[in-house]
Amino acid sequence: MKVAVLGAGAWGTALAGHLAARHDTLLWARDAALIAGLQARHENSRYLDGIALPDALRYDADLGAALAHGAADDALCVIAAPVAGLRTLFGAMRDAGCVPAHVVWVCKGFEADTHLLPHQVIAAELPGQHSNGVLSGPSFAREVGLALPVALTVASTSAECRERTLAAFHHGAMRIYTGDDVVGVEVGGAVKNVLAIATGIADGLGLGLNARAALVTRGLAEMSRLGVALGGRAETFTGLTGLGDLILTATGDLSRNRTVGLQLAAGRSLNDILGALGHVAEGVRCAQAVLALARAQSIEMPITEAVCGVLFDGVAPRDAVSGLLRRDARAE
């Protein structure tokens, strides 16, 4: 199978390395210097340093060439760009007149200004593209790059997209499950990043494992309430893309969003944290969108609201925790 991976950050690079073990895989990035480094060293020293990539993996900075590689009926196009870049990338596909027949995205979050999920963005930009879906689940790029075991879920309303994604990814140390709850999978992937910031704050303040367990559990309730209101199914949030991804991102020290929370608790400014991180922290980008959607649906999301207070309103992390503890008692 031909596979084009669009986006050579840590996640796109790790997935491309996995795919290249079985398939004719091309990795694209708009940064020609990054591509030149990949071609010379077969290592992404900027985003996934120390991990050798397969010799068979090819690289290109020409979007047209990448789209042509992934646009055949028997090919797959994997979108590994951040949510913030989806609309531009889909628009470029449309303008180039080279829309892949089968598309799966691996980014997580809401579009910041429109509050749309990725499947809504592709519907707006590529209305004729119907074989598409989302691949998500508890996964750190570095561990995938090291070929450690991982389980992910592909969700699509297209059986052909599910089958093609399964055929592409389900080998080696990667296990793929299938489903059709696109909304539930996308909401879980977005909200867990915000909740991971909350858990990082609590851990950074030294509040203990009891507090961590409470935040994860009550955070899952927030995720599920919003997801169901937006059209997802409740059972999705107890699976890999909900609870599984939340546990990993909230507790794993490779988590960028957890790192943001830890650093906020240590008193660092958000700008300094993001500048030093060098990678996207989607929880910061989409926190306000999550809260706005919750308010529009009249859904209480106090943990998310507390995170937004710390990120954007100057609330001290310890004061945000105190605010949560002062909430009125209620039935679970």
Curated annotation (Swiss-Prot):
Its EC number is 1.1.1.94. Disulfide bonds: none annotated. Keywords: Cytoplasm, Lipid biosynthesis, Lipid metabolism, NAD, NADP, Nucleotide-binding, Oxidoreductase, Phospholipid biosynthesis, Phospholipid metabolism. GO terms for biological process: carbohydrate metabolic process; glycerol-3-phosphate biosynthetic process; glycerol-3-phosphate catabolic process; glycerophospholipid metabolic process; phospholipid biosynthetic process. Pfam families: NAD_Gly3P_dh_C, NAD_Gly3P_dh_N. Belongs to the NAD-dependent glycerol-3-phosphate dehydrogenase family. This is Glycerol-3-phosphate dehydrogenase [NAD(P)+]. The gene is gpsA.
